[in-house]
From Swiss-Prot:
Extent of the signal sequence: none
Domain Ketosynthase family 3 (KS3) as annotated: residue spans: 3-412
EC class (word): transferase
GO cellular component annotations of the record: cytosol
Residue positions binding platensimycin: T271, H304, T308, P309, A310, H341
Pathway it works in: Lipid metabolism; fatty acid biosynthesis
Protein name: 3-oxoacyl-[acyl-carrier-protein] synthase 2
Function: Involved in the type II fatty acid elongation cycle. Catalyzes the elongation of a wide range of acyl-ACP by the addition of two carbons from malonyl-ACP to an acyl acceptor. Can efficiently catalyze the conversion of palmitoleoyl-ACP (cis-hexadec-9-enoyl-ACP) to cis-vaccenoyl-ACP (cis-octadec-11-enoyl-ACP), an essential step in the thermal regulation of fatty acid composition. Is able to catalyze the condensation reaction when CoA is the carrier for both substrates.
SS bonds (residue pairs): none
Keyword Lipid metabolism in annotation: yes
Organism: Escherichia coli (strain K12)
SUPFAM superfamilies per the UniProt record, alphabetical: Thiolase-like (SSF53901)
Length: 413
């Protein structure tokens, strides 16, 4: 069975450094950090008091105040990013094509904020105080649900929740839905709002978060000797994926082609990768096989790079394993150094960065990388963005708790 080609024709995003794709990209190329002190709840008892927050968010032109009360913030973020992507694509929905257009949008955690609020209502006032909208306001698949309802999309609607790999997995599976003929267009990505009391407290209890409260903007420092954990980030990233001939026929703007998708499992530990990065290497190898290219053809790797002691070293080793002699030449950076870790949305926003790197032939930096750790000796594009030429392929990595891994490869077109 021959697969159909899949291209990217629309992009949408909310991030800690910008509320649009272009404002975010401009900030990243300038090396700007979006990490700040948490101001929406009292953090005095918390070991970590900062995160990558979405700022100046207003969605009233898209979602009424009445409807906002029925949605956790992650759903609102996802809808706004989805609308941006749909508008960017210029796609017209008709009665004829609606059955061939769907959505694949996930979240690592879902509506944690409203889960907390409704639990408080339950404890204070009993079950009658729980909102009747509690369940649909918090479950993971509701970004896809709302967007299909808003646009009348009657194709596949799915939501994959695989922790921090959710964004990549939804995009990859959406591409396969198109490639194997079950849809012509898919809105795909991820959304997250985990900077809540329970989210910050839970990751803090696991000692996964940085506690650099005296200098939050320097807290996310992938591959640096002084890294002490990741930084939570909020936001959403959405891509419109489209079958190539369908996109050409309507004269769509094409950002890139999605040519490779690879997955694997560590089968090692609940939250830590093996030191040799074998699972990450396998995901990259599978993506390269799917794309039909050699590792040496990749110009840039947008790394998972979370700023954790174990994860950063394992990924560096995985890149060395897969790229071999080419490892010293490939550019590898972690945009999480500026945005923090958007969990289930990370792979989605970072796929967009990988696509824009192809468009502009520019690679965003890894900021805060002052003293690379032992074994972390790749070209991590420290401090400043890098202009390149002739870059044809980029690779985006995402790895999650439970040992789930995913890689995507994009091609300039």
């Amino acid at each position: 069975m021959s697969k159909r080609r899949v291209v990217v024709t629309g992009l949408g995003m909310l991030s800690p450094v910008g509320n649009t794709v272009e404002s975010t990209w401009k900030a990243l190329l300038a090396g700007q950090s979006g990490i700040s002190l948490i101001d929406h709840f009292d953090t005095s008892a918390y070991a970590t008091k900062f995160a990558g927050l979405v700022k100046d968010f207003n969605c009233e032109d898209i979602i009424s105040r009445k409807e906002q009360r029925k949605m956790d913030a992650f759903i609102q973020y996802g809808i706004v990013a989805g609308v941006q992507a749909m508008q960017d694509s210029g796609l017209e929905i008709t009665e004829e094509n609606a059955t061939r257009i769907g959505a694949a949008i996930g979240s690592g955690i879902g509506g944690l904020g409203l889960i907390e609020e409704n639990h408080t209502s339950l404890m204070n006032g009993g079950p009658r105080k729980i909102s009747p909208f509690f369940v649909p306001s918090t479950i993971v698949n509701m970004v896809a649900g709302h967007l299909t309802i808003m646009y009348g999309l009657r194709g596949p609607s799915i939501s994959i929740a695989t922790a921090c790999t959710s964004g990549v997995h939804n995009i990859g599976h959406a591409a396969r839905i198109i490639a194997y003929g079950d849809a012509d267009v898919m809105v795909a990505g991820g959304a997250e709002k985990a900077s809540t009391p329970l989210g910050v407290g839970g990751f803090g209890a696991a000692r996964a978060l940085s506690t650099r409260n005296d200098n939050p903007q320097a807290a996310s420092r992938p591959w640096d000797k002084e890294r002490d954990g990741f930084v939570l980030g909020d936001g959403a990233g959405m891509l419109v994926l489209e079958e190539y001939e369908h996109a050409k026929k309507r004269g769509a703007k094409i950002y890139a082609e999605l040519v490779g998708f690879g997955m694997s499992s560590d089968a090692y530990h609940m939250t830590s990768p093996p030191e040799n990065g074998a699972g990450a290497a396998l995901a990259m190898a599978n993506a390269l096989r799917d794309a039909g290219i050699e590792a040496s053809q990749i110009g840039y790797v947008n790394a998972h790079g979370t700023s954790t002691p174990a994860g950063d070293k394992a990924e560096a080793q995985a890149v060395k394993t897969i790229f071999g002699e080419a490892a010293s030449r490939v550019l590898v950076s972690s945009t999480k150094s500026m945005t923090g870790h958007l969990l289930g949305a990370a792979g989605a926003v970072e796929s967009i960065y990988s696509i824009l790197a192809l468009r502009d032939q520019a690679v965003p930096p890894t900021i805060n990388l002052d003293n690379p750790d032992e074994g972390c000796d790749l070209d991590f594009v420290p401090h400043e963005a890098r202009q390149v030429s002739g870059m044809e392929y980029t690779l985006c990595n995402s790895f999650g708790f439970g040992g789930t891994n995913g890689s995507l490869i994009f091609k300039k077109i």
